[in-house]
Amino acid sequence: KTLGGDNMPLLKEETYTIDDIYTLPDGERAELIDGRMYIMAPPSRKHQRISTRLVSIIDRYIEEHKGKCEVYAAPFAVYLDERSNTYVEPDISVICDPDKLDDRGCKGAPDWIIEIVSPASKKMDYLLKLLKYRFAGVKEYWIVDSEKNRVIVYNFTGDESVNDYTLQDFVKVGIYEDFVIDFGSMEL
Protein backbone atom coordinates (compact mmCIF):
# COMPACT_ATOMS: atom_id res chain seq x y z
CA LYS A 1 0.00 0.00 0.00
CA THR A 2 1.09 3.53 -0.60
CA LEU A 3 0.25 6.46 1.61
CA GLY A 4 -2.01 9.35 0.75
CA GLY A 5 -3.30 12.39 2.52
CA ASP A 6 -2.09 12.60 6.10
CA ASN A 7 -0.64 9.07 6.14
CA MET A 8 -4.02 7.63 5.32
CA PRO A 9 -3.36 4.48 3.29
CA LEU A 10 -4.39 4.36 -0.31
CA LEU A 11 -4.76 1.05 -2.04
CA LYS A 12 -2.72 2.22 -5.04
CA GLU A 13 -2.09 5.34 -7.07
CA GLU A 14 -4.90 5.13 -9.59
CA THR A 15 -8.41 6.40 -10.14
CA TYR A 16 -11.16 4.56 -8.28
CA THR A 17 -14.94 4.64 -8.52
CA ILE A 18 -17.76 3.92 -6.11
CA ASP A 19 -17.85 0.37 -7.49
CA ASP A 20 -14.41 -0.15 -5.93
CA ILE A 21 -15.77 0.91 -2.53
CA TYR A 22 -18.39 -1.85 -2.73
CA THR A 23 -15.73 -4.49 -3.42
CA LEU A 24 -13.74 -3.78 -0.25
CA PRO A 25 -13.47 -6.67 2.22
CA ASP A 26 -16.11 -6.78 4.97
CA GLY A 27 -15.25 -4.46 7.82
CA GLU A 28 -12.92 -2.27 5.77
CA ARG A 29 -14.15 1.28 5.26
CA ALA A 30 -12.88 3.88 2.83
CA GLU A 31 -13.80 7.23 1.37
CA LEU A 32 -13.40 8.22 -2.24
CA ILE A 33 -12.52 11.81 -3.10
CA ASP A 34 -11.92 12.76 -6.72
CA GLY A 35 -11.09 9.18 -7.56
CA ARG A 36 -8.56 8.69 -4.73
CA MET A 37 -9.42 6.05 -2.16
CA TYR A 38 -8.61 6.69 1.50
CA ILE A 39 -8.85 3.76 3.90
CA MET A 40 -10.42 4.82 7.19
CA ALA A 41 -8.90 3.89 10.54
CA PRO A 42 -11.29 2.69 13.25
CA PRO A 43 -12.45 5.58 15.46
CA SER A 44 -11.23 5.97 19.03
CA ARG A 45 -13.46 5.57 22.07
CA LYS A 46 -13.46 9.36 22.63
CA HIS A 47 -14.40 9.94 18.99
CA GLN A 48 -17.33 7.57 19.36
CA ARG A 49 -18.43 9.17 22.65
CA ILE A 50 -18.50 12.62 21.01
CA SER A 51 -20.37 11.27 17.99
CA THR A 52 -22.93 9.38 20.07
CA ARG A 53 -23.66 12.37 22.28
CA LEU A 54 -24.00 14.78 19.37
CA VAL A 55 -26.28 12.45 17.39
CA SER A 56 -28.46 11.99 20.48
CA ILE A 57 -28.73 15.77 21.06
CA ILE A 58 -29.48 16.48 17.39
CA ASP A 59 -32.01 13.65 17.09
CA ARG A 60 -33.81 14.77 20.26
CA TYR A 61 -34.01 18.36 18.95
CA ILE A 62 -35.44 17.22 15.61
CA GLU A 63 -38.04 14.98 17.27
CA GLU A 64 -39.09 17.58 19.86
CA HIS A 65 -39.57 20.18 17.13
CA LYS A 66 -41.26 17.72 14.76
CA GLY A 67 -38.60 18.53 12.20
CA LYS A 68 -38.34 17.03 8.75
CA CYS A 69 -34.57 16.58 8.91
CA GLU A 70 -32.89 13.26 9.67
CA VAL A 71 -29.57 12.67 11.41
CA TYR A 72 -27.21 9.79 10.58
CA ALA A 73 -23.94 8.70 12.15
CA ALA A 74 -21.14 7.01 10.22
CA PRO A 75 -21.01 4.64 8.55
CA PHE A 76 -23.54 6.39 6.33
CA ALA A 77 -22.93 6.82 2.60
CA VAL A 78 -22.95 10.30 1.09
CA TYR A 79 -22.61 10.62 -2.68
CA LEU A 80 -21.73 14.31 -3.01
CA ASP A 81 -22.31 14.58 -6.75
CA GLU A 82 -23.53 12.72 -9.80
CA ARG A 83 -20.06 11.52 -10.70
CA SER A 84 -18.92 8.15 -9.43
CA ASN A 85 -15.58 9.30 -8.01
CA THR A 86 -16.62 10.93 -4.71
CA TYR A 87 -18.10 9.00 -1.79
CA VAL A 88 -17.73 10.07 1.84
CA GLU A 89 -18.89 8.84 5.24
CA PRO A 90 -19.12 11.96 7.43
CA ASP A 91 -19.13 11.29 11.16
CA ILE A 92 -22.55 12.97 11.37
CA SER A 93 -24.87 14.00 8.53
CA VAL A 94 -28.11 15.95 8.81
CA ILE A 95 -30.32 15.82 5.72
CA CYS A 96 -33.48 17.94 5.45
CA ASP A 97 -34.56 17.01 1.91
CA PRO A 98 -36.15 13.53 1.95
CA ASP A 99 -35.71 13.28 -1.83
CA LYS A 100 -31.95 12.98 -1.30
CA LEU A 101 -32.34 9.83 0.79
CA ASP A 102 -32.61 6.26 -0.45
CA ASP A 103 -31.61 2.83 0.85
CA ARG A 104 -27.97 3.41 -0.11
CA GLY A 105 -27.60 6.75 1.71
CA CYS A 106 -27.69 10.40 0.67
CA LYS A 107 -27.44 11.52 -2.94
CA GLY A 108 -26.27 15.11 -2.88
CA ALA A 109 -25.05 17.40 -0.14
CA PRO A 110 -26.39 17.02 3.40
CA ASP A 111 -27.50 20.29 4.99
CA TRP A 112 -25.14 19.92 7.96
CA ILE A 113 -22.03 17.77 8.36
CA ILE A 114 -19.95 17.24 11.48
CA GLU A 115 -16.49 15.66 11.30
CA ILE A 116 -14.75 14.63 14.52
CA VAL A 117 -11.02 14.92 13.98
CA SER A 118 -8.76 11.95 14.59
CA PRO A 119 -4.97 11.93 14.15
CA ALA A 120 -5.27 10.21 10.77
CA SER A 121 -8.04 12.47 9.46
CA LYS A 122 -6.72 15.98 10.23
CA LYS A 123 -5.68 16.90 6.71
CA MET A 124 -8.85 15.41 5.25
CA ASP A 125 -11.20 17.16 7.70
CA TYR A 126 -9.49 20.56 7.78
CA LEU A 127 -8.65 20.89 4.08
CA LEU A 128 -9.89 18.38 1.54
CA LYS A 129 -13.37 17.78 2.95
CA LEU A 130 -13.83 21.44 3.82
CA LEU A 131 -13.50 22.34 0.14
CA LYS A 132 -15.51 19.37 -1.14
CA TYR A 133 -18.39 20.07 1.25
CA ARG A 134 -18.44 23.80 0.47
CA PHE A 135 -18.56 23.32 -3.29
CA ALA A 136 -21.02 20.41 -3.09
CA GLY A 137 -23.61 22.63 -1.39
CA VAL A 138 -23.37 21.69 2.29
CA LYS A 139 -24.90 24.58 4.26
CA GLU A 140 -23.01 24.09 7.51
CA TYR A 141 -19.82 22.18 8.37
CA TRP A 142 -18.50 21.62 11.88
CA ILE A 143 -15.03 20.33 12.74
CA VAL A 144 -14.85 19.01 16.30
CA ASP A 145 -11.23 18.65 17.42
CA SER A 146 -10.97 17.34 20.98
CA GLU A 147 -7.16 17.42 20.86
CA LYS A 148 -7.24 21.18 20.28
CA ASN A 149 -10.35 21.70 22.47
CA ARG A 150 -12.16 23.42 19.62
CA VAL A 151 -15.19 23.41 17.39
CA ILE A 152 -14.91 25.28 14.11
CA VAL A 153 -18.22 26.16 12.47
CA TYR A 154 -18.31 26.99 8.76
CA ASN A 155 -21.56 28.51 7.55
CA PHE A 156 -21.53 28.26 3.76
CA THR A 157 -24.74 30.26 3.25
CA GLY A 158 -25.09 34.02 3.17
CA ASP A 159 -21.92 35.64 4.48
CA GLU A 160 -20.01 32.34 4.63
CA SER A 161 -18.91 32.94 8.21
CA VAL A 162 -16.38 30.94 10.21
CA ASN A 163 -16.61 30.80 14.00
CA ASP A 164 -14.23 29.18 16.47
CA TYR A 165 -15.44 27.78 19.81
CA THR A 166 -14.06 25.66 22.65
CA LEU A 167 -15.50 22.38 23.88
CA GLN A 168 -16.94 24.30 26.85
CA ASP A 169 -18.96 26.77 24.74
CA PHE A 170 -22.56 27.00 23.60
CA VAL A 171 -22.55 26.60 19.81
CA LYS A 172 -25.43 27.87 17.67
CA VAL A 173 -26.60 25.60 14.88
CA GLY A 174 -26.97 27.66 11.72
CA ILE A 175 -29.57 25.56 9.90
CA TYR A 176 -32.03 26.02 12.79
CA GLU A 177 -33.33 29.24 14.33
CA ASP A 178 -33.25 28.20 17.99
CA PHE A 179 -30.87 25.25 18.33
CA VAL A 180 -27.77 25.65 20.50
CA ILE A 181 -25.52 22.79 21.60
CA ASP A 182 -23.92 23.11 25.03
CA PHE A 183 -20.59 21.34 24.63
CA GLY A 184 -19.69 22.08 28.26
CA SER A 185 -22.50 19.86 29.52
CA MET A 186 -21.54 16.88 27.34
CA GLU A 187 -18.80 15.61 29.70
CA LEU A 188 -16.43 14.74 26.90
Where are each of the predicted segments found?
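Gly/Pro/Ser/Thr-rich low-complexity, intrinsically disordered segments predominantly at protein N-termini
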Residues: 1-188
